[in-house]
Amino acid sequence: MEFSYFLPVNIQFGWNKVDNVADFAAPYGKKALIVTGRTSAKKSGLYDRVVAKLDAAHIGHVLFDQVDANPLTTTALDGAALAKSENCNMVIAIGGGSIMDCAKGIAFMAVNEGDINDYIFNRKTSDNALPLIVIPTTCGTGSEGNGFGVLTNPETGDKKSLRCNAIVPKVSIVDPAVMGTMPPHVLASVGFDALCHNIEAYTSKTAQPFTDALAHYAVTLLAQYLVPLYKHVKAMAEGKPAVLNETQLTKAWESVTLASTIGGMVINTAGVTLAHGMEHPASGLKDITHGVGLAVIEPVAVEYTWRANPDKFGALARMFNHGDGSELGEALRLIVHDLDLTTNLTELGFTKKDIPWLVDNVYVVATGNIANTVAEISRKDIEALYKKMF
């Protein structure tokens, strides 16, 4: 046995940990670029809460609130330009995966020159970035736990990760208390993404003992708590009786949030595989929500790959009360149904005419994901799998 495990991230997990943001930020300077989406952090009051703590500690700040879902390379460059012009010492991200990923690009390009796409495609490298502090407000992408920042080039539609240790957050403030403002459909999407991260890391070619232990634990948490939590949040949004009592709700939020962070951590080392490799072209082309795309793709992907490692896929299936790896795809479809997610690409606006572009783009942005998949897969196989999703 031989492996390496290195993940220099400071996870600060707990209820109301966000109130300590100034203490965590103080070692990194006296002025922060705060990166958010356009409205949600302000509407929830979290932005004002963070700013109040920074003000009390005499830490200056400037706001960049132009990040949308599926963040663009151009947006990251705009944020980096603002960080430079305002002489910011650090970046603080408040939001979901899109905000955290874009903040990583901002922190990186604030101290590096040239075309960000050169770094994304490894034509250039750097291990420098502004210090980054993240406050995730969704429990799905796990961006708080790794050195990946997924960005889309608006000119080409290429959706691919900027990857380096410099953009691993210096501090990740993982606070279950700030997750409660998520609408049900967002929780469903990000929660399924978290599940996919752990499944793919657990079954990847580069899986190893540490990632196996973490991912296995995270899947057990999600198998137990994700659907009940979603049903509770949905019931509350619809004015219906609560599904969970207060004690159960606290445990569910903690468990799903922790599993999400673990998912981000394990993919930093063990990577993702076929489903993510096929989804990034889809959300690069149509700007669909990542977790929604995975809900269509992951069941098909595991049905293709399970025979290459029946022991691990079988262990996963049994976590969902199914018999062996051959049943994992069906287990995931039941979860997709319970989360009210989409089941085919047609519903997401795709036609079969899109398949050639999707297949070609897999080999532009996701060759590493394909190589990390335990089953051998060809271009014709990928084309056939896309066809199954209509």
Could you describe each region identified by the protein language model?
Residues 287-346:
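Active-site pocket-lining segment
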Residues 148-270:
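Carboxylate- and glycine-rich phosphate/diphosphate-binding segment that chelates Mg2+/Mn2+
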Residues 74-177:
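Glycine/threonine-rich beta-strand-loop-alpha-helix active-site module
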Residues 1-90, 345:
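ATP/NTP phosphate-donor binding region
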Residues 323-390:
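C-terminal charged capping/lid subdomain of soluble metabolic enzymes
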Residues 140, 261-294, 368-369:
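Glycine-rich phosphate/pyrophosphate-binding beta-alpha loops
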Residues 18-21, 43-46, 73-74, 98-104, ...:
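Short glycine/serine/threonine-rich phosphate/pyrophosphate-binding segments
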